[in-house]
From Swiss-Prot:
It comes from the Eukaryota. The keyword Coiled coil applies. InterPro entries: A/G_cyclase (IPR001054), A/G_cyclase_CS (IPR018297), ANF_lig-bd_rcpt (IPR001828), Cyclic_nucleotide_synthase (IPR050401), Kinase-like_dom_sf (IPR011009), Nucleotide_cyclase (IPR029787), Peripla_BP_I (IPR028082), Prot_kinase_dom (IPR000719). The keyword Magnesium applies. Pfam families: ANF_receptor, Guanylate_cyc, PK_Tyr_Ser-Thr. Mg(2+) 1 binds at D923, D967. Disulfide bonds: none annotated. Expressed specifically in AFD sensory neurons. It comes from Caenorhabditis elegans. Glycans are attached at N72, N369, N456. This is Receptor-type guanylate cyclase gcy-18. SUPFAM superfamilies: Nucleotide cyclase (SSF55073), Periplasmic binding protein-like I (SSF53822), Protein kinase-like (PK-like) (SSF56112). Guanylate cyclase involved in the production of the second messenger cGMP. Regulates thermotaxis responses in AFD sensory neurons. May regulate AFD neuronal activity such as calcium responses to temperature gradients. GO terms for molecular function: ATP binding; GTP binding; guanylate cyclase activity; metal ion binding; peptide receptor activity; protein kinase activity.
Length: 1113
């Protein structure tokens, strides 16, 4: 009904309009003609004599909440700025539309005819703007659009009173995109779009502007509106793009979703290198969408962002800057609103709405200043003309960010020559390596003088582009890509003959080099295969420690020495029965053997001496590891012997060990090998005949060179369990000072440490130094340093080679003077004055005289050990028997003797049902009261004394105590050993003896108090058995247990209560006891039961006296 009325008003209540053509002078002095409509309207005057101008605002249902409040805040700001309030006043009438078809038209008619508004702000919906604008033109009132508007309303010859404050529309962003193309001289482009009216309209606008500016569209591909990345790739159109263009403009109806699919497709098709540039005009339907690589939870989707590599987004200057949100929120908070009151995603809508009212106020103020004529205030075209080329500061001031400091931010509003907001755009480069997009250029509008937008149908502005970043493109020199590659899209413009020729020549030279290399390596490998020390992994059979132990058996007679645990952990068998130990080194690349290496290894293989451990060979260049193999010695190393506290070493051992080491060194120094190079205690092995054999000789220097070349890793061997390595961390202690210094000096100079410059004599002098350290360890079973020396710290101290520590003899009292002098000579810092190995051998043989072999000495020691072992076995056997007796006694106290014997024999004790047995329960009366007035220790002492007496009563009457829990005491007879009918008699005697025992028992800490108890027993069938594995318990089960407990609990202090069954059993088999019937008693779980008191034994005066005493109490 309302809509009908409004349309009647439109067609039948139209005021008389005078039409007049008048010239107007713009700010730049140029004349501009327009048609002026006089609607004859008069303004209302309020009580304060202010002219009231009504403004109609047409919003949208469900969009931009609290938009009316924003307009009121804008109005308050205008009053503060003095634009409104002195002589005029704005009255804003807000209505909502967009919910039904053309509802905004009806709302506009209502606002004009009913409320007599003199200006429109809105409508928000683009579908209703065209119709409402035509009506406003007809009525000659200004209309200001603050949302994204369609291109159809751009013609000012039709829409004569329309001003647009929105900062981004299809026309403006098309102008910015084309300006960017011209800036980078991209005159050949392709367009990727989709079907649908929205995309068609956008493409049409872009094509028109490109044609005007001379940009050629070389290819246009169109996808379905609901397509995805897979369909785009399968369509084959991406290949057409790659064959015809390098600059691609993405114009989709849904910019966010379809561009995401398109960029994923180009990424998959490998169209994401530096030759391609993808320009995405960021056209949005209304609200400010999140970028595609930001998820709903605000987290970045790195994989999606990677797809946008080499993409350029054209958007307004604050498109990726959220600082405007905080500035706007801060302004509205001053007027009582909160951030939650607005839709932040549509922040631009609020900013444009705010600025729309200010634009109208500035135009009104300008009209009043010029004419002070009310007729001009209500003249829509006159006011619209004053909006042209107007510039003012909007709701948000100029951005203060680093990238926006030279650009007009969204707060600066510049209207062009047709009263449209002049665009301010930026181009943003998306870098996968940065969290935020990078602003590359700013595009700010500059008005063109001497230009009439009504005549040439343009805004009379040009975009000025300022470069912010350069050299950022992922090309070799950082320059932007060309619109057409130098060699063409398919490489057809370039000849590659020279490149192909040079490349072929290079490939040929590489192939020749590779052939020569492999030929050389083949010959080298053949030569290595012929070496006597070469061993292949396939010839090795690796064995574990259990297999080694079985192979090391030496017979039935064993001693402490023969059972020494050796440090050699890695064992293998070569061929059939050659037992070896090996050192494993991680190999990172093939080892290159020089001539000196092969000669040395051959000499080591050929070396034969009684005191040298045979070098069996090396396995290398296989399975990423190198193995150095030596013959296995079953007795371990000297280090194992020295630091084993169970081994007693006398002078014979000292002499034999030192003699063998000197003989081995003497042979090495006289052989082609020349020296040992790494003498340590773990390199001195002992075979099954107790002869010392030197190992790891000569190999240390090649290993160190191979490590420096990066072929092997010796550090891995240092950290292993194998203590017989040639390069342990502590081996540095045994090295001569000059060798350490030389090694570090060479390392600092970057020289190859081949030791070639070291003379043979100096290397032999280094062996003498190491021998002195080893001999000291043999004699004193310690290193020649103070007892509090930390070996790890000492190793670190010596590691850099710039510091040395001189060894010292710590115990000179038991050392022969000749050996004292010899050790000092061996440790001399001057290698020239150290003795030769021959002199060392002669001196040691004179002092450490050894007759015979160590085997004879070992046989004597074994005999002594066997004698001592017999005595030790006898002593230990006696101790074991005593322990077994004590254990048996303790076990029989915890469990019945029969059960304990069964468990000791390893047999399980099966549960058993006893047809007749008697169970007794006793309880201390007032136990809680006694405990409350006693300490825990006093309670324990009291119970211990009481239960000790009870235990004697049980033992005397052949009963068995089952358990005690606190003050409760449980006794049984007839279990586990059955005793026919005697169990009731035993229990009766036990109860009477316990009662008799209490007559003389005094509480230790309360001598004046007497302990009183209740007793109760019952006769019946009982099940018994051992329960539990840990702390097994002998437990009783059955109704007899429960009835016995009830006999105790329902009894009287000092009295012994029995069940009717127990009474019948005693009367039938043991009439010596006197009993008295108590009567019927209510028993829990049994109902009414007939019970009896056990009073005495016939002829027992003591128990009678006890009963009299109890009755007296």
């Amino acid at each position: 009904m309302l809509k009908t009325l409004l349309f009647i008003l439109i067609f039948f209540n139209i005021p008389i309009i005078a039409i007049e053509e008048i010239p107007d002078i713009k700010e730049n002095g140029e004349k501009s003609s327009y048609t002026q409509f006089d609607n004859g309207a008069k303004l209302e005057v309020n009580k304060e004599h202010k002219r009231v101008i009504k403004i109609g605002h047409i919003g949208a249902v469900g969009v931009m909440p609290n938009d009316a409040r924003i307009l009121n805040i804008s109005k308050e700001n205008l009053i503060e700025e003095g634009l409104v309030g002195d002589d005029i006043e704005f009255e804003i009438v807000s209505r909502q539309a967009c919910s039904e078809s053309f509802e905004g038209v009806a709302v506009a008619a209502e606002l004009y005819h009913v409320h007599q508004v003199r200006a429109f702000i809105g409508p928000y919906c683009a579908a209703e703007l065209e119709a409402v604008t035509k009506m406003a033109t007809f009525w000659n009132i200004p209309i200001i659009s603050y949302s994204s508007v369609p291109n159809a309303v751009s013609d000012r010859s039709v829409y004569k009173t329309l001003a647009r404050v929105s900062s981004k529309n299809t026309n403006s962003i098309a102008e910015a995109t084309v300006a960017l193309l011209l800036h980078y001289k991209w005159l050949k482009v392709a367009i990727a779009t989709n079907t649908g009216s929205t995309a068609f309209e956008r493409v049409s606008i872009f094509e028109e502007i490109m044609h005007r500016e001379g940009v050629t569209i070389v290819k246009k591909v169109m996808f379905d509106e609901n397509t995805d990345a897979n369909e785009m790739m399968n369509s084959g159109q991406l290949g057409d793009l790659a064959a015809n263009a390098r600059i691609i403009i993405c114009l989709f109806s849904s910019t966010k979703e379809l561009s995401k699919e398109f960029m994923q497709a180009t990424y998959t098709m490998r169209m994401n290198n530096a030759e391609y540039a993808y320009i995405i005009p960021w056209l949005q339907s209304g609200t400010k969408d999140l970028t595609p690589w930001i998820g709903a939870d605000g987290e970045m989707l790195q994989r999606v962002k990677d797809h946008y590599a080499n993409a350029i987004i054209v958007d307004d200057v604050n498109g990726f800057d959220d600082s405007v949100v905080s500035s706007f929120v801060e302004k509205i908070e001053k007027h009582g609103m909160q951030k939650s009151d607005i839709d932040v995603t549509n922040i631009n809508g609020y900013l444009h709405l705010f600025d729309s009212l200010k634009l109208y106020a500035l135009a009104i103020r300008k009209v009043l200043n010029e004419t002070d004529n009310e007729a001009y205030v209500t003249n829509g075209q006159f006011i619209w003309n004053r909006m042209r080329r107007m510039k003012f500061e909007g709701v948000v001031s100029r951005s203060s960010s680093e990238e926006n400091k030279d650009a007009g931010a969204i707060g600066t509003v510049l209207m062009d020559d047709v009263a449209d907001r002049a665009p301010i755009f930026s181009a943003f480069y998306i870098s996968p390596n940065r969290d935020k997009v990078m602003k590359m250029v700013n595009m700010e509008s500059e008005l063109i003088s001497n230009c009439d937008g009504l005549k040439n149908k343009s805004g009379c502005f040009q975009l000025k582009i300022n470069d912010i970043k350069s050299g950022f493109w992922p090309s070799e020199d950082g320059s932007m890509p060309l619109d057409e590659p130098i060699c063409g899209y398919r490489g057809q413009r370039c000849s590659y003959l020279l490149e192909i020729s040079v490349g072929s020549l290079i490939i040929l030279l590489i192939l020749i080099s590779v052939v020569f290399f492999f030929l050389f390596r083949y010959c080298e490998n053949k030569q290595l295969e012929k070496m006597p020390w070469r061993i292949f992994h396939d010839d090795l059979q690796f064995i574990d420690e259990e297999q080694v132990k079985s192979m090391m058996s030496v017979g039935s007679v064993t001693t402490k020495l023969s059972n020494i645990q050796t440090g050699q952990k890695q064992h293998a068998i070569i061929g059939v029965n050659t037992h070896t130990t090996y050192h494993r080194y991680k190999q990172r690349r093939p080892i290159k053997f020089i001539k000196e290496d092969m000669q040395l290894l051959t000499q080591m293989k050929q070396a034969v001496h009684d005191n040298l451990n045979p070098f069996l060979g090396a396995a290398f260049n296989e399975k990423e590891e190198m193995l150095v193999l030596w013959k296995f010695c079953s007795r371990g190393t000297i280090q194992d012997i020295i630091y084993n506290a169970n081994v007693v070493l006398d002078e014979k051992f000292h002499g034999a060990f030192v003699r063998d080491i000197t003989l081995g060194l003497e042979y090495l120094h006289a052989s082609p090998i020349g020296y040992h190079g790494s003498l340590t205690p773990w390199c001195c092995l002992i075979d099954r005949n107790w002869m010392v054999k030197l190992s790891d000789y000569g190999i240390a220097n090649p290993l160190e060179r191979w490590e420096k070349q990066g072929a092997i890793e010796i550090a891995a061997a240092k950290d292993s369990d194998d203590k017989s390595q040639a390069s342990q961390a502590t081996s540095i202690i045994y090295m001569a000072p000059e060798l350490l210094k030389n090694r570090e000096t060479n390392k600092r100079r970057g020289m190859d440490q081949s030791w070639v410059k070291q003379s043979m004599l100096r290397r032999q002098a280094g062996d003498i130094y190491s021998f002195g350290m080893v001999m000291y360890e043999i004699l004193f079973r310690s290193l020649p340093f103070r007892d509090n020396t930390n070996i790890s710290e000492l190793v670190d101290y010596l590691a850099d080679g710039s510091k040395t520590v001189s060894p010292e003899i710590q115990n000179q009292m038991g050392l022969h003077p000749d050996l004292n002098a010899l050790l000092r000579d061996c440790w001399s810092e001057n290698p020239e004055i150290r003795p030769s190995i021959r002199r060392v051998r002669l001196n040691t043989e004179m002092v450490l005289k050894t007759k015979g072999s160590l085997v004879d000495q070992m046989m004597k020691m074994m005999e002594q050990y066997a004698n001592n072992l017999e005595k030790l076995v006898a002593e230990r056997t006696g101790m074991l028997e005593e322990a077994n007796i004590r254990a048996d006694q303790l076990l029989t106290q915890l469990l019945p003797a029969y059960v304990a014997n069964e468990l000791k024999m390893g047999r399980s004790v099966a549960p058993k049902l006893y047809s007749s047995a008697t169970i007794l329960f006793s309880d201390i009366v007032g136990f809680t009261t006694i405990c409350s007035g006693s300490t825990p220790l006093e309670v324990v002492n009291m119970l211990n004394g009481l239960y000790t007496g009870f235990d004697e009563c049980i033992t005397r009457n052949k009963s068995y105590k089952v358990e005690t829990i606190g003050d409760a005491y449980m006794v049984v007879s007839g279990i586990p050993e059955e005793n026919e009918y005697n169990h009731s008699r035993n229990i009766a005697n036990t109860a009477l003896d316990m009662r008799q025992y209490l007559t003389g028992y005094q509480i230790p800490h309360r001598p004046t108090h007497r302990v009183r108890c209740r007793w109760g027993f019952h006769t019946g069938s009982v099940a018994a058995g051992v329960v539990g594995l840990t702390c097994p318990r002998y437990c009783l089960f059955g109704d007899t247990v429960n009835v016995s407990s009830r006999m105790e609990s329902t009894g009287t202090p000092g009295m012994i209560q029995m069940s009717e069954e127990a009474h019948m059993h005693i009367r039938a088999h043991h009439p010596v006891f006197t009993t008295t019937e108590r009567g019927e008693v209510q028993v829990k779980g049994k109902g009414t039961c007939r019970t009896f008191w056990l009073e005495d034994r016939v002829g027992d005066a003591s128990t009678t006296n006890y009963i009299q005493n109890v009755e007296g109490v």
